[in-house]
Amino acid sequence: MGDEPLLQKVKIQEDIESVPLLQKVKIQEDIESVKGIRVNNDGEEDGPVTLILLFTTFTALCGTFSYGTAAGFTSPAQTGIMAGLNLSLAEFSFFGAVLTIGGLVGAAMSGKLADVFGRRGALGVSNSFCMAGWLMIAFSQATWSLDIGRLFLGVAAGVASYVVPVYIVEIAPKKVRGTFSAINSLVMCASVAVTYLLGSVISWQKLALISTVPCVFEFVGLFFIPESPRWLSRNGRVKESEVSLQRLRGNNTDITKEAAEIKKYMDNLQEFKEDGFFDLFNPRYSRVVTVGIGLLVLQQLGGLSGYTFYLSSIFKKSGFPNNVGVMMASVVQSVTSVLGIVIVDKYGRRSLLTVATIMMCLGSLITGLSFLFQSYGLLEHYTPISTFMGVLVFLTSITIGIGGIPWVMISEMTPINIKGSAGTLCNLTSWSSNWFVSYTFNFLFQWSSSGVFFIYTMISGVGILFVMKMVPETRGRSLEEIQAAITR
């Protein structure tokens, strides 16, 4: 009896080379159980962070940086563009808003692009629109070319806002997947801050030209980075998938278990056809769609675009110095984004989302109360600082959770056979909500400077309950485990 585990181990070792790849995973687990070693399901022995993984992530994040420069461009460029091209306020407002129209176009085709051409191919399409957009803006001599350039930037942003987080989630080891994905939010905040800083000291034409630099980096990088192993496997290119995974994990890393897990999951999906848009409403995918759409609606209708697009108007109304407020807000966002990167894989997505949604609600409540007291002539001396504090609390909620984690979780939860359709639906929802909030904010702010923030407070309050009730925890689990559990 005492020799039985040893004999079992010998038999397992003899059989290893004679079985297919999928069975090796089970055999390895048997060996570990014989040795008394716990099978790793938490990513503790997950693949290492390699140079090619870092370079691939950097290349993808250039797309996010370009999106951030587009979002931040209008604030420092407004005076120069209106004077240089003799634009009216209405014409410049249209120039700013056309980004969201382009975003809707990009969002509508993002999922299909990523499915047909791969994640890397979709990034190439996004990069082409981005480069063309910035060059058109930089050399614009008329309103029409300015608007078309801005429209192209929106298309690029609409594609990149979906493809970048999906690509990063699919290539990163699960132990650092949340950290790598959270860098997306940091890059977004940093790019807006950098654009504002540069725009305050150089002309808008030079700012547009400099904004092509991330596009150039991305263009070069796309020639050297691997395609997503999961996309390759889904399309029947198993050998290429294993080669891609080996490059990402390093030549000295045993990818047998991870490759087998991916292949097994993809094989199981073969019994399902490539589901179309209307198949998303199948009860099988109800929770995926509900959580994904719910988080994005919460993100936008909770006031994200209202704060970010009209931050200057908020500070001006409260009496807080605009330049100081915007600069300090950019610094705080960058610092708290770093904090989000550090803690996202330590405390989990759901926990951070709960805290972030509470902060989102609190930030809007403080801002709303500040303007309410101001309207009644109460505590007016404290209105500027209390408004500033409310804005900072809200923006911190964006950087530590509500800004980036919804996209991370959508990428983690969505099975690859509906990723294109679900990505398109989620992206369209996000950009439509973005447009709605950015369009209505000025009207609501004029109607009641406090009322608009109380509306955001109520929406965020509902969001707290939604996160606590509906959102699953995905930290430390493989994509295949997450997707199998949520689509039962």
Swiss-Prot record:
It is found in: Membrane. It comes from the Eukaryota. GO terms for molecular function: sugar transmembrane transporter activity. The keyword Transport applies. Keywords: Membrane, Sugar transport, Transmembrane, Transmembrane helix, Transport. It is a multi-pass membrane protein. The keyword Transmembrane helix applies. SUPFAM superfamilies: MFS general substrate transporter. Its main location: membrane. GO terms for cellular component: membrane. The chain crosses the membrane at residues 51-71, 89-109, 116-138, 151-171, 182-202, 207-227, 291-311, 324-344, 353-373, 390-410, 423-445, 451-471. Disulfide bonds: none annotated. Pfam families: Sugar_tr. Belongs to the major facilitator superfamily. Sugar transporter (TC 2.A.1.1) family. Sugar transporter. This is Putative sugar transporter ERD6-like 13.
